[in-house]
Regions:
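Sec-dependent N-terminal signal peptides
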Residues: 4-16
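Repetitive, compositionally biased segments used for assembly/scaffolding
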Residues: 21-175
Length: 175
């Protein structure tokens, strides 16, 4: 009986040392996130929605707002990235994120599996090619993997880190 209790104690210490505790007690390691994404991968994207979003019709208004530091507008939320791209989430379509180049051309469309954390997202090119998969653990933490499951980045707050812990991109977050 003592051996059993000792083994259970050691196993619980080992497993908890390999995971990060997130708000609400949800734990995800890089491996957990990778497996969740690969095991639930969609077969295709819903491209009916993409047609109206190939060009950002409100590009000038969006860029102007971002230059002023405004990210929340009446019908949408904006995000600005350090590589001169930006993203839009429309209030009436919160399960999609549209990513545009600085000239307002669609470069990626992302589909969310849910709106409750933790949830999966899958990012596609306008031609429908899967680019990456993410596991949104919380509002401030996201794991990003390529289509083969290699970790591309780990967002924590405003910074995205590579596997070595180097900052590879930043973003502005509004509260």
């Amino acid at each position: 009986m003592k051996k059993f209790i000792l083994i259970i104690g050691i196993l619980s210490l080992i497993s908890s040392s390999n995971a990060a505790t997130i708000t609400g007690g949800v734990e995800y390691t890089t491996t957990d996130a990778r497996l969740e994404l690969q095991n639930n991968r969609p077969t295709s994207a819903d491209f009916i929605l993409y047609g109206n979003n190939y060009i950002d019709a409100k590009r000038d208004e969006n860029i102007s707002a971002l230059l002023k530091g405004v990210t929340k507008l009446n019908d949408r939320t904006l995000a600005q990235f350090s590589d001169d791209t930006y993203g839009i989430i429309y209030n009436n379509d919160p399960k999609h994120v549209w990513y545009y180049s600085n000239d307002g051309t669609l470069i990626y469309a992302e589909e969310k599996a849910s709106l409750k954390y933790p949830y999966r997202t899958y990012k596609y090119t306008p031609d429908g090619e899967l680019v990456n998969m993410t596991m949104r653990v919380s509002e401030s933490e996201t794991f990003i993997f390529d289509t083969l499951g290699k970790l591309l980045g780990h967002w924590v707050g405003q910074n995205c880190y590579d596997e070595s812990g180097n900052i590879v991109m930043t973003r502005k977050i509004s509260k």
